[in-house]
């Protein structure tokens, strides 16, 4: 699979038909999976040339996008593509898009590639001092654990349930912090 080299300046939230998964978003914004139908993802500006990308370069559900560069050990963080229906999506600058040859349960690989078991393999392969990077040739040397499809489904469902609970609790904490700030501003006048 092929990624592109478009910078943030080549992207727009207002214009464009082809979405772009940027490495910075893989590192910071997206979790173990990114729901293309619901996530805010920038598009490649319409005046940029995307004709060189074949249909196999466009991401599909179940594809994995690794961030190949970071300023810390976040390098190699991965996100799994889910919720893709009619959108066209390319993997962007400093990413490594991967398409599994076998069928995996939805979200299993997103969780697995961010697990300690997998990331400990990646850490040994990282290159660089100030900016860390990993290459496709190193990623293909890693080993993955492949339980039965049913077990993959159970693992992904359990972890997703925990993630959903964490998101709800985070929203509650943010609301309480906002309320507290408001009270502190108005109570002691």
Label each PLM-derived region with a short phrase.
Residues 1-36, 69:
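Low-complexity, Lys/Gly-biased intrinsically disordered segments
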Residues 2, 119-121, 127, 131, ...:
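Glutamine-centric residue-chemistry signal
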Residues 7-8, 52-53, 84, 128, ...:
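Short, solvent-exposed loop/turn positions at domain surfaces
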Residues 8, 13-15, 87-95, 104-107, ...:
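A short glycine-rich beta-alpha junction/loop motif
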Residues 22-23, 39-114:
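A short beta-sheet element
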Residues 32-35, 90, 110, 123-124:
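Short, charged, solvent-exposed linker or helix-capping segments at domain edges/interfaces
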Residues 141, 145-189:
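Amphipathic alpha-helical coiled-coil/heptad-repeat segments
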């Amino acid at each position: 699979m092929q990624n592109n080299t478009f910078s943030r300046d080549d992207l727009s939230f207002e214009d464009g038909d082809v979405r772009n998964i940027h490495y910075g978003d893989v590192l910071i914004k997206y979790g173990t999976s990114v729901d293309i139908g619901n996530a805010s993802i920038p598009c490649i500006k319409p005046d940029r040339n995307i004709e060189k990308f074949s249909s196999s370069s466009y991401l599909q559900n179940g594809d994995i996008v690794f961030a190949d560069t970071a300023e810390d050990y976040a390098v190699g963080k991965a996100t799994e593509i889910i919720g893709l229906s009619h959108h066209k999506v390319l993997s962007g600058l400093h990413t490594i898009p991967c398409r599994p040859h076998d069928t995996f349960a939805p979200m299993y690989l997103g969780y697995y590639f961010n697990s300690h078991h997998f990331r400990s393999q990646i850490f040994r392969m990282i290159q660089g001092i100030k900016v860390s990077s990993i290459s496709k040739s190193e990623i293909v040397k890693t080993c993955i654990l492949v339980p039965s499809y049913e077990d993959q489904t159970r693992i992904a469902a359990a972890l997703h349930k925990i993630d959903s609970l964490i998101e709800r609790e985070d929203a509650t904490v943010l609301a309480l912090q906002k309320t507290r700030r408001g009270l502190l501003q108005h109570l002691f006048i």
